[in-house]
């Protein structure tokens, strides 16, 4: 279950109902998908082949189709980041630059952990700490950035409004 940390006051929201309510009030789509469907050989696997990535997409194809039909998404892929990723530190520096997109940014966490820091409606930032099974959609035009948690590894399904993906605006 995702958890929230509000930057300015460093308070946390950890209760499932309260997390869902907070995100809904901020216009952030949050869903919990059944991660137990993932085959054991793909669980916590950060060295994915193209075949592994295709298998992950197939496992969650119904959920991807459902959210895509509801929200107009047209493309998806799988990304894997870990200490074995070439230039991981450079990538993280780039990901941690505050930006926005003209469409929403959707991630489903398959393995590992990630953090989206999002500017709230009141202008203050909050972290959404994500774990396997969490799907989040950062609203279009919301200032945000992404980073990894201390384990420095994540496998995520990215879902896009257009087949070209998204373009960050810094």
Curated annotation (Swiss-Prot):
The keyword Metal-binding applies. Pfam families: ARD. Gene3D superfamilies: Jelly Rolls. Binds 1 Fe(2+) cation per monomer. SUPFAM superfamilies: RmlC-like cupins (SSF51182). Pathway: Amino-acid biosynthesis; L-methionine biosynthesis via salvage pathway; L-methionine from S-methyl-5-thio-alpha-D-ribose 1-phosphate: step 5/6. GO terms for biological process: L-methionine salvage from methylthioadenosine; L-methionine salvage from S-adenosylmethionine. GO terms for molecular function: acireductone dioxygenase (Ni2+-requiring) activity; acireductone dioxygenase [iron(II)-requiring] activity; iron ion binding; nickel cation binding. It is an enzyme of class 1 (oxidoreductase). The record marks 98 as: May play a role in metal incorporation in vivo. Fe(2+) binds at residues 99, 101, 105, 144. Ni(2+) binds at residues 99, 101, 105, 144. InterPro entries: ARD, ARD_bac, RmlC-like_jellyroll, RmlC_Cupin_sf. Its EC number is 1.13.11.54, 1.13.11.53. Keywords: Amino-acid biosynthesis, Dioxygenase, Iron, Metal-binding, Methionine biosynthesis, Nickel, Oxidoreductase. The record marks 107 as: Important to generate the dianion. The record marks 104 as: May play a role in transmitting local conformational changes. The keyword Oxidoreductase applies. Belongs to the acireductone dioxygenase (ARD) family. Monomer. Catalyzes 2 different reactions between oxygen and the acireductone 1,2-dihydroxy-3-keto-5-methylthiopentene (DHK-MTPene) depending upon the metal bound in the active site. Fe-containing acireductone dioxygenase (Fe-ARD) produces formate and 2-keto-4-methylthiobutyrate (KMTB), the alpha-ketoacid precursor of methionine in the methionine recycle pathway. Ni-containing acireductone dioxygenase (Ni-ARD) produces methylthiopropionate, carbon monoxide and formate, and does not lie on the methionine recycle pathway. This is Acireductone dioxygenase. It comes from Bacillus cereus (strain ZK / E33L).
């Amino acid at each position: 279950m995702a958890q929230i940390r509000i930057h300015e006051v460093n308070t946390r929201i950890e209760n499932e109902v309260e997390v869902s309510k907070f995100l809904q009030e901020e216009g952030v789509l949050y869903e919990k998908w059944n991660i137990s469907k993932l085959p054991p050989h793909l669980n916590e696997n950060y060295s994915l082949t193209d075949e592994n990535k295709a298998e992950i997409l197939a496992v969650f194809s119904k959920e991807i189709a459902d959210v895509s039909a509801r929200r107009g998404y047209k493309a998806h892929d799988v990304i894997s980041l870990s200490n074995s990723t070439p230039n991981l530190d450079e990538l993280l520096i780039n990901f941690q630059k505050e930006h926005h997109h003209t469409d929403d940014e959707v991630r489903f966490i398959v393995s590992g952990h990630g953090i989206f820091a999002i500017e709230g409606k009141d202008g203050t930032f909050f972290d959404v700490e994500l774990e396997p099974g969490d799907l989040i959609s950062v609203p279009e035009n919301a200032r945000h950035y992404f980073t990894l948690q201390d384990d420095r590894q994540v496998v995520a399904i990215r879902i896009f409004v257009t087949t070209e993906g998204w373009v960050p605006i810094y």
